[in-house]
Amino acid sequence: MRDNALAVSGLLVGRAGGPGVKPYQPPGLWNEVSLGGNVRFRQDTGENLYRKSMYTYWKRSAPAPSMTIFDAPTREKCMVERPRTNTPLQALVTLNDPQFTEAARNLAQRMIKEGGQTAQDRVTYGYRLVAARKPKPIVANILVAAYNEELENFKKNTEAADKLLDVGESKRDETINNAEHAAWTIVASMLLNLDEVITRL
């Protein structure tokens, strides 16, 4: 799911091979499980933040929380099939984890710059990127209405827009209006959290 979000946002680095990477993780990770607290988690920067999940550095006593929440195997033995679960924690990851928020911001930027001039065109473009099909008219209308509502909210609360757009290390296009970009980021997050995008049966 993380790789999919990074791919549609244009952030995914597809380079193969190399050492393990350390993407965004909660502060204080490893402090409780390292011997004497002498091993600290040091987050990577640059393109290492956007490598495929299979390259994520794995500490057996403190695996990446976002991967654990989605039932990633412990790597102690081979797993032929992963268990299927659905918990509120998973939604919290896809809605709030910096990697997903940053991916939504970059997907929003793609929708604005590549998706056309109207909100309807941008919604259709974003939907096709994440779901590989056009949205039904009723769904597109709901997403456009959500955009308009969020745009009004962010115009009134510019600090919230700035805070949302500051998530993540990737550079954003500063020529895009902050309120507009933040509103599209919310819509992009909604798209990345669609059931058909995050569930494979």
Residues of each region from the PLM?
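Amphipathic alpha-helical substructures
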Residues: 109-142
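Extracytoplasmic/periplasmic ligand-capture domains
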Residues: 152-156
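An acidic, gly/pro-interrupted, aromatic-rich
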Residues: 1-122, 159, 167-201
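Long, internal low-complexity/basic segments
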Residues: 138-142, 163-166, 176
